[in-house]
Amino acid sequence: EIRLSLVGSEMCIRDRANGGTVTFEESHFVVQPQISFSVMEQSTGYVKVLVGGRGDKNTDRGLNRATDDVARQPGSSIKPLVAYGPGLDTGAITLASAIDDAPYYYSGTDARLVKNYTEGEYLGYITVRAALTRSQNVPAVKVLTQITPAVGFSYLQKFGLSTLVSPQNAVNGNHDVVQSLALGGMTKGVSNIDMTAAYAAIANKGVYTKPIYYTKVLDSEGNVIIDNSIPETHKVLKESSAWLLTSGMESVVSSGTATRAKVSNQPTAGKTGTTQFDTDIWFCGFTPYYTASIWVGYDDNSRQVSSVNHTSIWRSIMEQIHSDLPSGEFTKPEDIVEVQVCSKSGKLPVEGLCDHDPRGSCIITEYFAADNQPTESCDTHVKVNICNVSGDIANTGCTSVSTRILTKKPSSDSIGSNDSGYTTRDAEYSITEDKLTKLCTLHQRASTSSTNSNSGSTSTNNSNKNNSTTPTTSASGTTNSSGSSGSTEKTTKHN
């Protein structure tokens, strides 16, 4: 869809005759939606391409949407810079960290429900890599909350974003040290070139380089009067953190929200960003050679009809730039290791549990910084014995029992049974901690102690009239339990 917007008019004298003046109105229109595009060579900081807009250039020193003070909201393209990058760099998370994508509210006075782009869809336990790939909002907000918005804000400063608003410089009481910063909720927004320079820092092994538009200025005699050839640089991320973040964003391009951005014959990493009503659409990404950002939107913030073409435009431009370049690679640092983990906990897998999840094995192989690899075993998966009649923890008197492997959650809120009205996709495979201690009261327990050989847990007989005994949990994470409609592993009947 192409629209035209009137940005100015001029009354011009066309003819003079018989003492009268005939005039006409000359109008200039700007094609909409508009675009900005910038390309940097991350190894040098050289700015190679600047596109400030669509349409014919009809004025000198006109608006340049790539560099001028035309800040736009970045949407999810900010997530790697403010949440996941800092989280990896501080050791707060790994790419395998399991975050519960469930109904979640901002804290304090801003008690709004955090919604995902696909409204009402919550996936349950999801790794950081998967959350980044699918651009789920709740995990990003939870990560920023964990590291604190102040830390995320400080990283954005190091990434060179020039439009940030600190609490000390609040505009009408608004500033950027807030949880919603994880989703691009900024007071002013960002510029295209700032986003390109920030992503170039990730591509440059964590080192930020201030964009260089020229290297020197000569006088009429060829003497250098301004030397701009020495780049201004500083460290933002550890090399291992930058590589891990790059690996996560490669998944965004290979199987996530930016599959159309894949540059032929080059590894490609990046992140999409879309604001409410599609008023701002972004893709920021890089290859081993160049980093580029594209923004598409209406100058008057009108809603856009489609948001899929921007990644194709990005790819088309980048493929021309790379046409004569050999295939590169994102060189893996020596302190990166591969470890098998459980995708529902981010920890080392427990045999017989993590590999027997009713949805399929949850054992995955993930990359880690050597100094931040998991050492603890999964404590999310549990094997539970459930009374098929009451749905509670089976006691020794229950005659129909199902053995299931479920994932443990802290409360009913984490499976959506709160006032949000939503449920998580993994609800039927989950059990809350309170239900792990709720024993079946419909059946009389057997008069002698019995040990459940299927789960490795023991139910102990006592004289408690309400049949409520606390179930024991074995070292393997097994317990007699209840409260799910998940797949049955084994059903036993006690006579």
What are these regions (language model features)?
Residues 339-454:
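Low-complexity, Gly/Ser/Thr/Pro-rich intrinsically disordered linker/tail segments
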